[in-house]
Amino acid sequence: MTLNRVVVTGYGLTSPIGNTPEEFWNNLHDGKIGIGPITKFDNSEIPVHNAGEIHDFPFDKYFVRKDKNRMDQYSLYAIYATLEALENAKLDMDTVDRDRTGVIVSSGIGGLQEMQDQIIRMHEKGIKRIQPMFIPKALSNMAAGNIALRIGARGVCKSITTACASSNDAIGEAFREIKFGYHDVILAGGAESTINEIGIGGFNALTALSTT
């Protein structure tokens, strides 16, 4: 069996210290700190007051307003990073075999903000008022699914959920898919958006977050 060489041809990201690889690297090199006071919710009742929020996410570059209604924030982050990676790689999807192009993008939790919002909505307005897109927005595999739909990839499409190792496992699985000839191209990585009451509150209850 001939094993294929596997290479990284492009990369993209959104983070508290940059939304392009160049910006991220320069800020990292210069010692810029992306951790700061939590602004997304009132955290006065818990001892955790700092987090790595993304304040300048360039939503308008790839999305329209209705995308917020059908995708959780973590999916938007994942799609943005993917499209940036394709641009970085100068990869035209019309030049690849879409049936041999896959997406393995993981999330440890998935659409946690949507889960929180809909649970509150249910308690305030009743079970019949849960919004139809709740499940598609909340599922942890929907970042991968939304990416595949956006770029037209028809190969493997999955999410590997292994807590904090989820993205690392996705990259390893992508390596295997290409190495052994199952696919030619894999978009691999991970995304998360859990800076909210239930996310920070939950990890605080676990005593897994710094209080300084």
Roles of regions detected by a PLM:
Residues 1-67:
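ACP-dependent fatty acid/polyketide chain-elongation machinery
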Residues 40-91, 140-154:
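A glycine- and small-residue-enriched flexible loop/hinge segment at structural boundaries
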